Amino acid sequence: MKSDRKHVVVAVSGGFDPVHVGHVRMFQNAKKLGDKLIVILNNDNWLSKKKGFVFMPQHERKELLESIAGVDKVVLTRHQANPTDMSVNAELAHLKPDIFVNGGDRKLGNVPEVAVCNQIGCKMVFNIGKGGKVQSSSWLLKAYVQNAADCPCGSGKKFKKCHMAHG
């Protein structure tokens, strides 16, 4: 899917479990970099390995992502149970996007997709989104489990006061 076609293809990836406003902002800003936005969605096997559980099943996450304005396609990863490769290298090699966007706390030194992006000629872009990492699925789930205890973002506030509109 290189740019010798008419359209510049942008890809993003993540578990998105659950989807939150930071993800939506990342998608909006990523879409501005090209014509087509593909979201590579890490499957339930990947989430189970990374977090030890799945909060929202992959088919529900996929349906939500497909409903977000600006998202043109959602591709589910093919990670097997208990994967050793936690990257989206296979999906990037298959899709061959022009740009691979990373949000939040990702940077060149901590993403495993650098080599495949170099190989396929895909530009990597970091820190996409409005205001950096504004929310985290892990923060949301941790606060829920802890009954809205101290916000894990380090603000010193209770989670509801820090990140909820009517907290």
Language model regions located:
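Acidic/negatively charged segments and metal-coordination signatures
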Residues: 145-167
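Nucleotidyltransferase catalytic core that binds NTPs
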Residues: 1-147
